[in-house]
Amino acid sequence: MKSEKIVQKNPNQESVWDYPRPPRIEDSHKHIQVIFNGVMIAETQRAMRVLETSHPPVYYIPPEDVRLECFSASPRSTFCEYKGSAAYYTIRVGERTKTHAAWFYPRPAAPYAALANYVAVYPSRMDVCYVGGIRSSA
C-alpha cells in the first residue's frame, strides 16, 4: 500500500497548486538552454513563462532563438481551452529524431497573443534542458 506524504514547501519555493487558472504569462530573463543529441537547439534569455494550476512552468522560446532548421512540422495538433490550437514539431539532429517533441501556437487566443510562434519543448524528450543553470526535471 502506498503511503501519501504531504510535502511542505519552503517559503521561497513555488508550488504548482499556487499557479492560476486560467494560466498567466510572465516574461522570463532566465538563461534557457535546450540540448538535443549533443547540440544546443535553443538558447535564450527572452522566454515567456506560462504558469497554470497543477502544471509545471512551461518556457516558450522566441523562434529567432531556436535552431529551426532542426525542427519540422508534425501532423499532430491539440487544443487548449485558453490558448487555442497548438501545432507540433518533430526535432531531428543528425540521425536522432523525436516526434512531437515541441509545440507552438500559430494564432493563440487574444489573452495569449504574446506566445504566437514561440516554441516550447518537452524536457523529458531532450538530452537536457537548463533553466537559469538548473537542470529541468519536468
Each language-model region and where it sits:
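Terminal leader/tail segments of proteins
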Residues: M1-A138
